[in-house]
Amino acid sequence: MTPPISPADATPVDSWLDMLQQVARHYGLPHSGQLAKLTGLWAGLDGEQARVRGMARALGLSVRFRPVGGREPLTGWRLPMIVRMADGALALVTAIGEDGEATLTLSGEAGLMAYRPIADIAREASMVVIARPARAAPDMRVDPYIHKQEENWLRRILWQ
């Protein structure tokens, strides 16, 4: 389990909001940034993890907190993932190349991409936050083929 973070070590609400909004945009979720920010400010006394969970819920996301290292290395199977560095900075890792080079965005840099080896990120990381949509999004490719149940459909066919 991830150790609790003391308020002195807590990352500001705006940094978490920036990262979580980028994940919500990645999944195409409609969201209200102001609602998420207010949720984060109101949940500030409950600890950083509770604050991040509340903000994620307001954005339509579900989050899991994972410690870095051990059996769960930083791999492409968990992308996009938010990485909290030892100094408190947040980074959103969006891609990992075959050569081990990660594409990431740092909080507060307005979406500018940076490239660093994933081994360096794993060495400096203190926690990984995996955010996914809270519920499945409708698939526009399949929806036209799915019809609602019609009552008396057999009778209508037989009486034609």
Predicted features, each with a name:
Residues 1-160:
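Membrane-integrated ABC transporters
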